[in-house]
């Protein structure tokens, strides 16, 4: 995850 973006848990 990056800051606020989590495409794949």
Curated annotation (Swiss-Prot):
GO cellular component: extracellular region
GO MF, one annotated term: neurohypophyseal hormone activity
Subcellular location field: Secreted
Annotated S-S bridges: 1-6
Main localisation: secreted
Entry keyword set: Amidation, Disulfide bond, Hormone, Secreted
Keyword Disulfide bond tagged: yes
Residue numbers of Glycine amide PTMs: 9
Protein family (similarity comment): Belongs to the vasopressin/oxytocin family.
Protein's job: Displays oxytocic activity on rat uterus.
Protein name per Swiss-Prot or TrEMBL: Phasvatocin
Lineage of the organism: Eukaryota, Metazoa, Chordata, Craniata, Vertebrata
